[in-house]
């Protein structure tokens, strides 16, 4: 902090810097000085370390040199990209005054603040991933969450019912910045997020949020968007919009609506499920061997991003899913993949280009890419109209006629413009008469100078005379030192060099003034015309955004058709019964990485067969089998075809996985604690329509504790919840459950032992596995034979000395289960029956009856 006394000791320019920095204490300040952006004090030290640039000094503060670092203005994008990737925010301060007319320091102001969540520059963005900023608000135990994609204008909100749902939503959207209220008290739910930004409570004020949103959308109320009954979500949305305006320092016309995400409209996936199924990120944090890596061959970046949103948010609207299936079938039936994809590829990232147009930050090549995109629409429309597939025809009805806008860009811009408008050469010849005249004047300089040079050589007799130009002295006549004595008297010396003299004559000076004026006028007019292009395009922004969304969807559907054809996928069917029936299903990722043919397997889950106990050896394929069931179900619910011979799937509300676990050292949780936390979430949240995958529950504790927990969890899922469950276990005792409870079935993945080797068959068969094959797998892993031999001896000894035979252990569990079952499932009913039998309604007053009703409610939990 600079004291007032030290502040006054600084130069006016540094005082200006310090005032601007005080307004933006938490961001790096890029301060424009001529052709450089400079940073000072701690900003300079931080930037030098992060960007590997030189740290120098300038002037003094309190007797100490001021640290300084900087970079050329024309190279700033590369430095910004690196800082944004590191999670930093940067305030860009530009010179807006004219140095020639300024008294004191040139006027400067911050024109934008670049943050990880609000960037729109192409160089700063991951091409095939959404770049979202979010805000979260809390009131008691309820939450509001809003998300904004600055690169498309997509603005959404939801109200997670609890912190687990909030955590799952954040895992789905993966925001690069998350704004949270200073009074937020569930930090454990958000601490894993990047770019946490603490904001004051008043930014979440509901009435302010509603006013801001109505002003943004030009509406009187928010009923048209269906969000008026979501106050917590609106509070978060208001803070988010305010932050976006604060950082962009300009209008945001591409943000034209807001929508409400309803949890009941989508299949819910918690954070553990997204991680375990490796949808878009593998367990190592990379993108290889994920569902998206197999499924995403979209030819446009915006299509790729839309597909990933579909994967992370499968929908439950069967009619909409059937429309997607119909579209994929149409594309395949009419052989449209090869016809449509070349044109779609040229559409490119129209969505993000339009965002930059809205922010008036689009560069010349953005506009030429938009022109190219618009040029593809008639060809795409013609292909669809010729084949007349119903769904695709309806999709194209959302795309307006943009022939006028396309013609405008064709007339206005040259074929391949420079990167920036700064130096001109962007507007095409013939677009503006005045610009052509100024250009003709400046471009005619070459011929004029050649004629003047020839004339002066002849009149002076100096054959080495030549005319040149530099930025400092302008035009000049140059004569070598050996012939300088021949220079006419009207030649005025302008510069002396070691081997030559440079002169100026009135005629050349007059022409110089005219040329420089024409170049300046041409550049100023060109910049004006370029800005006017935005004015001409912005009235059509909404229609252009609808078109880009439709083209994104078309790209995804064509991609899914290509994947279905290439990978031999089939169209699944939907039914009303809560069930999953898959014939010869395959894991979509594993089958692509295996060198050997993938062994396809069936699965059938329904009312009479709702929990499968899966046994078999490690490496036998149990986890793959369970994951492929979940992935095939998920693919069906995004509208995709699936890797199977056939699939018939009923209503699913959630998918849960409890597969694998590791220590969460950062939170101080053991493997067993992580496992139990995930299991508790399933037992609390799962319903009869949930698909539940559980792999090896109870491994992280003693054998009897683990077996007891596994048995109790399986029984609870089968008897209380009745969800569709795949339950893999090494506890052979659990295979006795089908004899006691309806709806439980044993299946296993088999293996063959020969001599000391083992062969995994990877085929699912009915019944329980005959043995665990643990020692054979250990030998396969390379455990020394002497250790294997010792293990066999110990195994024989343990089996011989066991206090109970396997049958006796199972019988003991059955008896315990019977007694415990009474305690868990019947005791509640008996106590309730007894309480009701004791009740005499005629003896109760209304107040006593109400109190008794509350007591009965408490008894049932």
Curated annotation (Swiss-Prot):
Domain of life: Bacteria
Gene Ontology terms describing biological process: mismatch repair
One Pfam family in the UniProt entry: MutS_III
Keywords: ATP-binding, DNA damage, DNA repair, DNA-binding, Nucleotide-binding
GO cellular component, as recorded: cytosol
Entries under InterPro entries matching the protein: DNA_mismatch_repair_MutS, DNA_mismatch_repair_MutS-lik_N, DNA_mismatch_repair_MutS/MSH, DNA_mismatch_repair_MutS_C, DNA_mismatch_repair_MutS_clamp, DNA_mismatch_repair_MutS_core, DNA_mismatch_repair_MutS_N, DNA_mismatch_repair_MutS_sf
Binding residue positions for ATP: 616-623
Molecular function (Gene Ontology), one example: damaged DNA binding
Protein family (similarity comment): Belongs to the DNA mismatch repair MutS family.
Purpose: This protein is involved in the repair of mismatches in DNA. It is possible that it carries out the mismatch recognition step. This protein has a weak ATPase activity.
Protein name: DNA mismatch repair protein MutS
Organism field: Haemophilus influenzae (strain PittEE)
């Amino acid at each position: 902090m600079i004291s007032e006394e030290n502040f006054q000791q600084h130069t006016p320019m540094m005082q200006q810097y310090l005032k601007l920095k005080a307004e933006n204490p938490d961001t790096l300040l890029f301060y424009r000085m001529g052709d450089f952006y400079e940073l000072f004090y701690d900003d300079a030290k931080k930037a030098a370390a992060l960007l590997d640039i030189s740290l120098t000094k300038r002037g003094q503060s309190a007797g100490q040199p001021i640290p300084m670092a900087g970079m050329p203005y024309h190279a700033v994008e590369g430095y910004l990209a690196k800082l944004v990737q590191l999670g930093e925010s940067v305030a860009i301060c530009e010179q807006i005054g004219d140095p020639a007319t300024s008294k004191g320091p040139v006027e400067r102001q911050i024109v934008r603040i670049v943050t990880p969540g609000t960037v729109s520059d192409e160089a700063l963005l991951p091409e095939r991933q959404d770049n979202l900023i979010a805000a979260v608000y809390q009131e008691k135990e309820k939450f509001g969450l809003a998300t904004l994609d600055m690169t498309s204008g997509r603005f959404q909100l939801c109200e997670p019912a609890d912190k687990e749902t909030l955590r799952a939503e954040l895992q789905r959207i993966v925001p690069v910045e998350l704004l949270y209220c200073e009074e937020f008290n569930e930090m454990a739910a958000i601490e894993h997020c990047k770019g946490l930004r603490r904001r004051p409570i008043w930014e979440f004020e509901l009435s302010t949020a509603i006013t801001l949103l109505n002003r943004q959308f030009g509406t009187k109320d928010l009923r048209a968007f269906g969000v008026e009954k979501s106050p917590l979500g609106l509070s978060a949305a208001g803070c988010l919009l305010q932050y976006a305006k604060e950082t962009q320092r300009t209008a945001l016309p591409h943000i034209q609506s807001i929508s409400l995400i309803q949890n009941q409209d989508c299949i819910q996936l918690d954070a553990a499920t997204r991680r375990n199924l490796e949808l878009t990120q593998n367990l190592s944090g990379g993108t290889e061997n994920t569902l998206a890596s197999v499924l995403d061959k979209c030819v446009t970046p915006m299509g790729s991003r839309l597909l990933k949103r579909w994967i992370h948010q499968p929908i439950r609207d069967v009619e909409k899913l059937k429309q997607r299936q119909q579209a994929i079938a149409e594309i395949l039936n009419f052989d449209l993949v090869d016809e449509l994809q070349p044109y779609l590829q040229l559409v490119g990232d129209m969505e993000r280009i339009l965002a930059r147009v809205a922010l008036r930050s689009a560069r010349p090549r953005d506009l030429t890419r938009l022109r190219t995109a618009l040029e593809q629409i008639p060809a795409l429309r013609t292909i669809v109209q010729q084949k007349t597939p119903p769904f695709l025809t309806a999709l194209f009805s959302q795309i307006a006629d943009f022939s006028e806008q396309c013609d405008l860009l064709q007339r206005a811009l040259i074929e391949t413009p420079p990167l920036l408008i700064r130096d001109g050469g962007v507007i095409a010849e013939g677009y503006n008469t005045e610009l052509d005249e100024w250009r003709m004047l400046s471009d005619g300089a070459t011929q004029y100078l050649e004629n003047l040079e020839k004339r002066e050589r002849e009149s002076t007799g100096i054959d080495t005379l030549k005319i040149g130009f530099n930025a400092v002295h302008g035009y000049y006549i140059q004569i070598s030192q050996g012939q300088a004595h021949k220079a006419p008297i009207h030649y005025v010396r302008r510069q002396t060099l070691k081997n030559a003299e440079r002169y100026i004559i009135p005629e050349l000076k007059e022409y110089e003034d005219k040329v420089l004026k024409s170049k300046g006028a041409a550049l100023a007019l060109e910049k004006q015309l370029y800005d006017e292009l935005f004015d001409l395009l912005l009235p059509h922004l909404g229609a252009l955004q609808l078109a880009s969304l439709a083209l994104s969807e078309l790209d995804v559907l064509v991609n899914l058709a290509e994947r279905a054809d290439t990978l031999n996928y089939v169209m699944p069917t939907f039914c009303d019964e809560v069930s999953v029936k898959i014939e010869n299903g395959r894991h979509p990722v594993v089958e692509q990485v295996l060198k050997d043919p993938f062994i396809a397997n069936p699965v059938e889950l329904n009312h009479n067969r709702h929990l499968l106990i899966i046994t078999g050896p490690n490496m036998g394929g149990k986890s793959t089998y369970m994951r492929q069931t979940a992935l095939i179900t998920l693919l069906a619910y995004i509208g995709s075809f699936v890797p199977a011979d056939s699939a018939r799937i009923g209503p699913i509300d959630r998918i849960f996985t409890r597969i694998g676990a590791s220590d969460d050292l950062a939170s101080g949780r053991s493997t067993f604690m992580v496992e139990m936390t995930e299991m508790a979430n399933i037992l609390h949240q799962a319903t009869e329509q949930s698909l539940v995958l559980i792999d090896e529950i109870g491994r992280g504790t003693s054998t009897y504790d683990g077996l007891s927990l596994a048995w109790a969890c399986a029984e609870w899922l089968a008897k209380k919840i009745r969800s569709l469950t795949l339950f893999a276990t090494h506890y052979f005792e659990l295979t006795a459950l089908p004899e006691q409870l309806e709806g439980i079935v044993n299946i296993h993945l088999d293996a063959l032992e020969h001599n000391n080797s083992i062969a995994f068959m990877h085929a699912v068969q009915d019944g329980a596995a005959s043995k665990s094959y643990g020692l054979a797998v250990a030998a396969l892993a390379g455990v020394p034979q002497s250790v294997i031999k010792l293990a066999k001896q110990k195994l024989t000894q343990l089996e011989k000395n066991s206090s109970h035979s396997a049958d006796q252990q199972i019988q003991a569990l059955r008896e315990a289960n019977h007694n415990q079952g009474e305690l868990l499932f019947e005791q509640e009913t008996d106590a309730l029956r007894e309480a009701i039998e004791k009740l005499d309604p005629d003896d109760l007053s209304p107040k006593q009856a109400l109190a008794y009703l509350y007591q009965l409610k408490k008894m049932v939990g």
